[in-house]
Amino acid sequence: VREVLLLLFLSLPFTASAADAPWWGFALHGYPVTETRLAGLKYETGLAPHVVVFFLQWPSHGETGPFPEESLEAIWSQRALPCLTWEPMYYRDGQEITILADEILGGKYDAYLRDFAEHARRWGRPFLIRFAHEMNLDRYHWGTDRGGYGPESPQIYQRMFRYVVESFRRFGAYNVRWAFCPNAESVPYGDPSAVWNRPEAYYPGDDVVDVLGMDGYNWGMTKTREKDGWQSRWQTFGEIFENLYRSLTRLAPEKPVWVFETGSMNAGGDRTAWLREALSLAREWRLSGICWFQVDKEVDWRLDIRRDAEAVGIVRGGPPLPGYGSGGGE
């Protein structure tokens, strides 16, 4: 039954009705994802997700790298849909090194792509790949070095995205579905010379995108110009996502829309009220899913049932969670 439901979900296009609550998920930091970690997640949050987002970088060379079968199996065993955020970069001496588009398009990583696609095909079950997410942030500058991030970046990104998807199709990995996922706010922004950095400018085409995604956060009042170099403010879910949501649905109105990373702090407002509004607006917009960034990173975004019981209750009021009965009882 579980496999049938997930296969039905991936029989796109899929758009929730206004009466449907979105699927609930968590985005997790660290690799691999194990059944032990997922059990800890359920204990910590009181929630068993429909979707689990995780992250994997590429190898520094163009040969084979790890295929995340352990993580995929662990997520699947919990009756959840895996979503791999696949980052074309690697770490060297603690620094992120972005893989250049010329290396990917020139064939240096063809062996890696073939090996990964063939492993995905043999694994056989459906999962999402969120390739090179948040491409409209100069923090990533996918396909170029930081100095090369500029007006040519959208076209570079499109070529990379299409090349990767077409490689998977060439090797029969049709169980993989592809997510295009910009950030809610583009950086650089506010600069007339950066008008090229609109999320929709990066869109690689309907034929290689199955799911539309959005990332964005409410930092509340946690950041100050004096300490952090920028001033955060309280933002509602609607303030964060509406402009991007409207842009994406104009771009591809028949494709499902997900929030793959979000979270809210309490500083400056009420996180529980924020989450309530988020889920209400998600129904109105017919979002297919919302994934909470369950990570202690720049700030501690994590939900914890011991301090966030009311917020957890709001989430449990949605569709029955795997491992829970309707209404949220275990």
Q: Regions from the language model: what does each represent?
A:
Residues 66-87, 207-267:
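Glycoside hydrolase catalytic-domain groove-lining segments
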Residues 19-111, 264-266, 291:
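N-terminal substrate-binding region of glycoside hydrolase catalytic domains
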Residues 183-213, 269-279:
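Substrate-binding cleft/loops of secretory-pathway carbohydrate-active enzymes
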Residues 3-15:
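Sec-dependent N-terminal signal peptides
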Residues 27-28, 161, 165-197, 254-267, ...:
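Aromatic-lined carbohydrate-recognition surfaces of secreted/lumenal glycan-active proteins
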Residues 62-65, 69-176, 180:
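Substrate-binding cleft of extracellular glycoside hydrolase catalytic domains
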Residues 19-32, 127, 255-330:
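Substrate-binding cleft of secreted/luminal carbohydrate-active enzymes
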Residues 38-48, 66-84, 115-124, 201-207, ...:
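Acidic (Asp/Glu)-rich catalytic clusters
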